[in-house]
Amino acid sequence: MRILKLAALSCLLFIAPSLSINCDGLSKDQCEQNFPQCQILTAKSCCGESKSYCAERDSNDCLASKISCKKDPQGNIYEFWSSCTPSSGFTDFIPSNATCSSLNCNAQQMSCKYVQQACHETSCCPDIPQCQIPATGGGPATGSATGQGTSGGTPGSCDKVNCPNGYICTIVNQLAVCVSPSSSSSSSSSTTGSHTTTGGSTTGSHTTTGGSTTGSHTTTGGSTTGSHTTTGGSTTGSHTTTGGSTTGPTCGNVNCPRGYHCEVRGSQAVCVADEFDSCANVDCGSGYHCKNGECIRDKVECDACDQINCPKGHHCISQPKGGWIGSHKKRHWQLHPEHCGGRPNKIKVICVPSPKGTCKTVQCPKGYKCKLYADGPTCVKIEKPKCLTCKDMHCESNGLLCVLTPQKKTDEECCPIIPICINPSTIAASTIATTTASTRHSTASTIASLVTGTTSGGGGMGSFGGRSDEESSDPNAILGLFEDDIFWGDNDEYFSDNYRYVDEEDIDEDFNGNDEFEIDVEGDFQEDDFEEEYAFY
C-alpha cells in the first residue's frame, strides 16, 4: 500500500510542471486553446501596426487599462493598454513629456512648434516640441546704427531706459539698445537712418518695433506734441515736424528686443512685452489643435468595433453607457482600447462569445418576445408600461378638458392611448363625451354622449373629425371613430383588463342619431384585433 502511495505521489510530481502553462511565446491558436489561463491581446505600434501576443491573465482578468510603452529588439515602440503585458521580448520605453511651456521658447526670442514624428499613431509617440526662429516677423535687425544730434538735441542715453529681465541697455552710435549681456554692441539691433532735431521744444514719442526700418525723422523748431509708431515689417519713409527744441524721454533712441516695444511711461522710455497669443506661434500639426499654448489631440468620433477583428465564435460589443456588467468581464475574450480621438484610457470595446442560434427562427407566445443571449435565444416576458390616465393629468383643475388619443404604434411595450389636456375653446360645435367605468375586477362599461350641433364645412371637431351629422348618426360610422379620432374621457382609470373590443352587436338597436347611445363593453380585447374598431377608456 505504501508503495502505491509513493508511486502516485511521484506521478503527481512528474505531471505538476505540465499543469503550469507559460503563456509567453504561445501562438494565437495555442493561446486560445489555453483560455482562460492565457489571454490573447494586441498592442499597437507607433506606425499603426497591430501585434498580437499571449499573456497570462492576472487577478483583474486583464481588464485594468494601464497604458504602458515598450520597445522591441528592432526598435519599434508599442503601446500596451492592458495590465497583462509580455514578460520577455520587450523593454520599457518612456515617451517624451516635453511641452512648449516647459521649453519656454519665448525667453529665447523663439517660437515653439510641435513636430510630428514619422510614426505617431499612439500616445507612446507624441509630437515633439521644438524652439524655432520664425522665418518672418518683428524683432531687432542686425547691422549698424547711425544718428546725429543737432543744436538743442540730446544724444541717446540709458539713464531713463528700463530693459526687460535678462537684457541690459547699451549705447550703440548714440542709440539706447536693449541687448543680451552676451551680445556685443556690434551685433545689437539697429536702425539705418537719421534722427535730426533742430531747436524748439518737442514732446512726443517715436516708436519702432521689429523689422527693418529705413528713413528719417526730422524735427525743426516750434513746439509739437505727438507720436510716430512703426510696427514690424519693412518700412521706408520719413516723418517731419517743424517746431522748437526737444526735451524729455522719447522712444526714438530706444530699440527693444524681439517681443517687446517701447512706451514712454512718466519720465522713462520702457520696453514693454507685446501682447502674446499663446497659440500664435504654435504649430501642432495634423490631428492636434492648440489650446493655451498646448497641443491637444483632436476628438474624432468613431465606432471602435470597426477596428477590431474578434476570434472565431466571438463578436465585438461597445461599452454601454452604464459601464461593463459582470458577465461581460468574465466572458470576454479580447479587450481593445479606442484608438480614435483622445488617448485611450479606458477599455471601450471587448470581444465576447457569440450567441448560439437566432431569434429569426423563434416564435414566442403572446406576451413574450425573443432576446438573444450567449446561451441562445430566450423568450422573455414583455413588461407592460405604466400608462398615464386623465387622473394623472389634472386637466380640470387648470380649466382644461382631458381627452384620450389612440396611438398608431401598437407594440405591447407602448401605451395604446395617451391622455392630453386641451382648451375647451378649441372644440368646434358642441361635442361632449362622458366615460364611466367600474373597478378593475368588475365589468366595465362606457357611456358616450353625443350632442350634435351645427357644423360649417367638414373640418369641425363637433362631428368627430369632420364627419357630417348625417354620417355620425349611423352606428357603423360610430365604430370607426375610435381608431383615428380623439376619444373623450374623464378621470377614470384604464389599463390592461379594461381594454375591450367593441362589437357591432354591443350598440343598442334602438339607437337614433339624436339621442344618447350606449356601448356595452364585454368582448375581450385581442392584440390581433387592434387594427379593427374598438374603444378605450
From Swiss-Prot:
Glycans are attached at residue 97. Residues 183-246 are annotated as: Disordered. Residues 157-179, 250-272, 278-296, 358-380, 389-415 form the Follistatin-like domain. Residues 1-20 form the signal peptide. One of its GO terms (molecular function) is DNA binding. One of its GO terms (cellular component) is glycoprotein complex. The keyword Cytoplasm does not apply. The keyword Iron-sulfur does not apply. GO terms for biological process: slug development involved in sorocarp development; spore wall assembly; sporulation resulting in formation of a cellular spore. Residues 21-140 form the DSCP-N domain. It holds the Pfam family Dicty_spore_N. Keywords: Glycoprotein, Phosphoprotein, Repeat, Signal, Sporulation. It comes from the Eukaryota. InterPro entries: Dict_spore_N (IPR007643), Fol_N (IPR003645). Phosphorylated and fucosylated. This is Spore coat protein SP70. It comes from Dictyostelium discoideum. The gene is cotB.
